[in-house]
Amino acid sequence: MSFNFRIGQGYDVHAFGPGDHLMLGGVRMAHSHGVLAHSDGDVVLHALCDAMLGGLALGDIGVHFPPSDARWKGADSAQFVQHCDQLLRDRGWRVGNADITVICERPKVGPHALAMRERIAGLLAIELDAVSVKATTSEKLGFTGRSEGIAAQAAVLLGKIAA
């Protein structure tokens, strides 16, 4: 049986470390900390990539961009999204919509949500209303609640491109 839709979900987390900004959803935002990561550590775009790859059973971000590969040191995660999008398109699929949740106490994501949505919609060449970015806290519980790091979840609906 063949379906014209698939769902993918992704999750990413990074610990806070030295620095004065974060990259979230392709948007640079001032923050009291950076993140410990091989690339730019954009948890939003990393979770999005994992969701896109997962929808077509293409592995995960670590398979395509291993931290052991020096090419990805400090890399802009937008490159990862573009690569994943091309993998989907090469197989006849596109992202129909993306729903992303950032989990953190700080920074406050709300003021940056529109810019993040615009950046992601642009990377995927989809409508702005097909990208949702929202945030929640963990009510001071766990590593995000103690402000030790940041996490993101993403869900995507993939659609088969009509021939």
UniProtKB/Swiss-Prot annotation:
The record marks H38, T137 as: Transition state stabilizer. Its cofactor is a divalent metal cation. It catalyses: 4-CDP-2-C-methyl-D-erythritol 2-phosphate = 2-C-methyl-D-erythritol 2,4-cyclic diphosphate + CMP. The keyword Glycoprotein does not apply. A divalent metal cation binds at D12, H14, H46. Involved in the biosynthesis of isopentenyl diphosphate (IPP) and dimethylallyl diphosphate (DMAPP), two major building blocks of isoprenoid compounds. Catalyzes the conversion of 4-diphosphocytidyl-2-C-methyl-D-erythritol 2-phosphate (CDP-ME2P) to 2-C-methyl-D-erythritol 2,4-cyclodiphosphate (ME-CPP) with a corresponding release of cytidine 5-monophosphate (CMP). This is 2-C-methyl-D-erythritol 2,4-cyclodiphosphate synthase. It comes from Xanthomonas campestris pv. campestris (strain ATCC 33913 / DSM 3586 / NCPPB 528 / LMG 568 / P 25). The lineage of its organism: Bacteria, Pseudomonadati, Pseudomonadota, Gammaproteobacteria, Lysobacterales.
